[in-house]
Amino acid sequence: MSQESDHGSGDGLALQEAQPKVKRPPLYKVMLLNDDFTPMEFVVHVLMLFFGMNEEKATQVMLHVHTRGVGVCGVFSKDVAETKVQQVNAHARQNQHPLLCTMEEA
């Protein structure tokens, strides 16, 4: 019966366990799209309510969306981004505004 250790085969080489490579989950940008009907005040309200922005930051993002057609509200994990998109779109519909929120991989 052999007296070899579990860590080698007797040829001077030791086995080393490979460290699993952990890949970070992809992040997603949540974006608002400009339209000609949603009041600017409502967009600021949405940014403060769902993205935790203060009034100054929300106004800056709203103006960016208004002038460029689209603006990033935040970057989140997929589940959080999907939830925020659904919440914003539902809130806009409940208030009879056509504001549209989307997401894409960052």
From Swiss-Prot:
Q: What are the recorded Gene Ontology BP terms?
A: protein catabolic process; proteolysis
The record's Gene3D superfamilies line, in alphabetical order, gives: 3.30.1390.10
InterPro entries from the xrefs?
Answer: ClpS (IPR022935), ClpS_core (IPR003769), Ribosomal_bL12_C/ClpS-like (IPR014719)
Pfam families given in the database record: ClpS
Q: What does this protein do?
A: Involved in the modulation of the specificity of the ClpAP-mediated ATP-dependent protein degradation.
Q: What does the subunit section of this Swiss-Prot or TrEMBL entry state?
A: Binds to the N-terminal domain of the chaperone ClpA.
Q: Which NCBIfam families match?
A: PRK00033.1-2 (NF000669), PRK00033.1-5 (NF000672)
Q: Which family does it belong to?
A: Belongs to the ClpS family.
Q: What is this protein called?
A: ATP-dependent Clp protease adapter protein ClpS
